[in-house]
Swiss-Prot record:
Function: Major acute phase reactant.
A cellular component term, taken from the record's GO annotations: extracellular region
Entries under PANTHER family matching the protein: SERUM AMYLOID A, SERUM AMYLOID A PROTEIN
Family: Belongs to the SAA family.
Source organism: Sus scrofa (Pig)
Entry-linked InterPro entries: Serum_amyloid_A, Synovial_Prolif_Regulator
Subcellular location: Secreted
Signal peptide: 1-18
Source organism, top-level taxon: Eukaryota
Biased composition regions of type Basic and acidic residues, renumbered to the chain: 99-120
Official protein name in the record: Serum amyloid A-4 protein
Keywords, comma-separated and alphabetical: Secreted, Signal
Gene: SAA4
Keyword Transcription regulation: no
Sequence segments annotated as region (Disordered): 93-128
Length: 128
């Protein structure tokens, strides 16, 4: 636990720009909110093969907030990936490795500022 907290703190220090701590944390909270909204929309849409689009969209919107949003998107994506790996280790997950790689690619695509519609499945309602 101490190691985890230390890693979080170090990544915070490395991620803070000259804009200051307040704006960084504000961006991080807003970025986390963007990821949550994308996750909620994915669950609400319940549309086949739309997961990569929503992952890219959430990371894209978070990255638009600034360095804090990018940091939050990376942390949340990594925690989700580690949790998924733990579930696979315990035998509780059926997600394949190629799906994980594809999801990671979609998240990085969004964080880099590229258009998340690249992953948008045909027929997904315009609401999303």
């Amino acid at each position: 636990m101490k190691l985890f907290i230390g890693l979080i703190f170090c990544s915070l220090v490395m991620g803070v720009s000259s804009d200051g701590w307040f704006s960084f944390f504000k961006e991080a909270v807003q970025g986390a909110s963007d990821l949550w909204r994308a996750y909620w929309d994915m669950k609400e849409a319940n549309y086949q093969n739309s997961g990569r689009y929503f992952r890219a969209r959430g990371n894209y919107e978070a990255a638009q907030r600034g360095p804090g949003g990018i940091w939050a998107a990376k942390i949340i994506s990594n925690v989700g990936e580690y949790f998924q790996g733990l579930l696979q280790y315990l035998g509780s997950s059926s997600e394949r490795e190629e799906d994980q790689v594809s999801n990671r690619r979609a998240e990085e695509w969004g964080r880099s500022g590229q258009d998340p519609d690249h992953f948008r499945p045909a027929g997904l309602p315009k609401k999303y």
